[in-house]
Amino acid sequence: MAARLCCQLDPARDVLCLRPVGAESRGRPLPGPLGAIPPASPPVVPTDHGAHLSLRGLPVCAFSSAGPCALRFTSARRMETTVNAPGNLPKVLHKRTLGLSVMSTTDLEAYFKDCVFTEWEELGEEVRLKVFVLGGCRHKLVCPPAPCNFFTSA
């Protein structure tokens, strides 16, 4: 699997946004602006949502002509109840919501890359990614593994 996600902090909403930034699938790049942070409301997903592409573990809105929804880390409390979530991440996000200085934006982005995405990008493992986006995008996965049903329609 050769998918990459861009991790951006949106200071206006104080959320961390994840967006797919490229794909190796018949040489076609993902549509949508690569530098802009998506709007708060999810875009409408067209009928041709790109399910034929080889990417696994990304919601169908990743291939929308309007651009993908932000996969937002909005609920530290939700993550605290998740078995596989690293123990210090909910604390970091909770402190940020209280306005306490805990990590710089660069450090926070590096934390997500090192602890969340390395295994997913290099080995094709999506389990940890799905754990962290429980409170984010609600569109269905392109090819969800059998028991996983995190991205369900609203």
Swiss-Prot record:
UniProt entry keywords in alphabetical sequence:
Activation of host NF-kappa-B by virus, Activator, Apoptosis, Host cytoplasm, Host G2/M cell cycle arrest by virus, Host mitochondrion, Host nucleus, Host-virus interaction, Modulation of host cell cycle by virus, Transcription, Transcription regulation
- Role description: Multifunctional protein that plays a role in silencing host antiviral defenses and promoting viral transcription. Does not seem to be essential for HBV infection. May be directly involved in development of cirrhosis and liver cancer (hepatocellular carcinoma). Most of cytosolic activities involve modulation of cytosolic calcium. The effect on apoptosis is controversial depending on the cell types in which the studies have been conducted. May induce apoptosis by localizing in mitochondria and causing loss of mitochondrial membrane potential.
Q: Name one GO biological process term.
A: DNA-templated transcription
User: What HAMAP family does UniProt report for this protein, alphabetically?
Assistant: HBV_X (MF_04074)
Q: Which InterPro entries match?
A: Transactivation_prot_X
Does the UniProt entry include the keyword Transcription? yes
Query: What name does this protein carry?
Result: Protein X
- Name the encoding gene, please: X
Stored Pfam families: X
Which domain of life does the protein's organism represent? Viruses
Tell me which family the UniProt entry assigns to this protein. Answer: Belongs to the orthohepadnavirus protein X family.
Reported modifications of this chain: A fraction may be phosphorylated in insect cells and HepG2 cells, a human hepatoblastoma cell line. Phosphorylated in vitro by host protein kinase C or mitogen-activated protein kinase. N-acetylated in insect cells.
What does the record give as the organism's lineage?
A: Viruses, Riboviria, Pararnavirae, Artverviricota, Revtraviricetes
Report one GO cellular component. Answer: host cell nucleus
Subunit structure of this chain's protein = May form homodimer. May interact with host CEBPA, CFLAR, CREB1, DDB1, E4F1, HBXIP, HSPD1/HSP60, NFKBIA, POLR2E and SMAD4. Interacts with host SMC5-SMC6 complex and induces its degradation. Interacts with host TRPC4AP; leading to prevent ubiquitination of TRPC4AP. Interacts with host PLSCR1; this interaction promotes ubiquitination and degradation of HBx and impairs HBx-mediated cell proliferation.
Which organism encodes this protein? Hepatitis B virus genotype B2 (isolate Vietnam/16091/1992)
Q: Can you say where in the cell this protein is located?
A: Host cytoplasm; Host nucleus; Host mitochondrion
Q: Where is this region: Mitochondrial targeting sequence?
A: 68-117
The UniProt entry lists the main location of this chain as host cell
